[in-house]
């Protein structure tokens, strides 16, 4: 059976940590900033850790070689 390919869109959006957690960047910072408050924009910075159940699905289906 051939190896599973990694989804190229997923490898750009998600990163697997050394402990096996999945981290991702916050969404909603590309355009339309004028209608958001400074607090909302500030809170969208940085990365988040995905819930374990969702992270396991990402690894299994989209990042099999990750």
UniProtKB/Swiss-Prot annotation:
Keyword match Ligase: no
Gene3D superfamilies found in the cross-reference section: 4.10.410.60
Pfam families associated with the record: Ribosomal_L35p
InterPro entries in alphabetical order: Ribosomal_bL35, Ribosomal_bL35-like, Ribosomal_bL35_CS, Ribosomal_bL35_sf
Domain of life: Bacteria
Keyword Signal: no
GO biological process terms, semicolon-separated: translation
Keywords: Ribonucleoprotein, Ribosomal protein
Disulfide bond annotation, renumbered to this chain: none
One annotated Gene Ontology cellular component of this protein: cytosolic large ribosomal subunit
GO MF term set: structural constituent of ribosome
Alphabetized NCBIfam families for the sequence: rpmI_bact
Family: Belongs to the bacterial ribosomal protein bL35 family.
Annotated protein name in UniProt: Large ribosomal subunit protein bL35
Gene for this chain: rpmI
């Amino acid at each position: 059976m051939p190896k599973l390919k990694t989804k190229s869109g997923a490898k750009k959006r998600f990163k697997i940590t050394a402990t096996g957690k999945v981290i991702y960047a916050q969404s909603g910072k590309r355009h339309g900033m004028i209608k958001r408050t400074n607090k909302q924009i500030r809170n969208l910075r940085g990365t988040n850790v995905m819930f374990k159940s969702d992270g396991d699905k990402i690894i299994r289906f989209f990042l099999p070689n990750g």
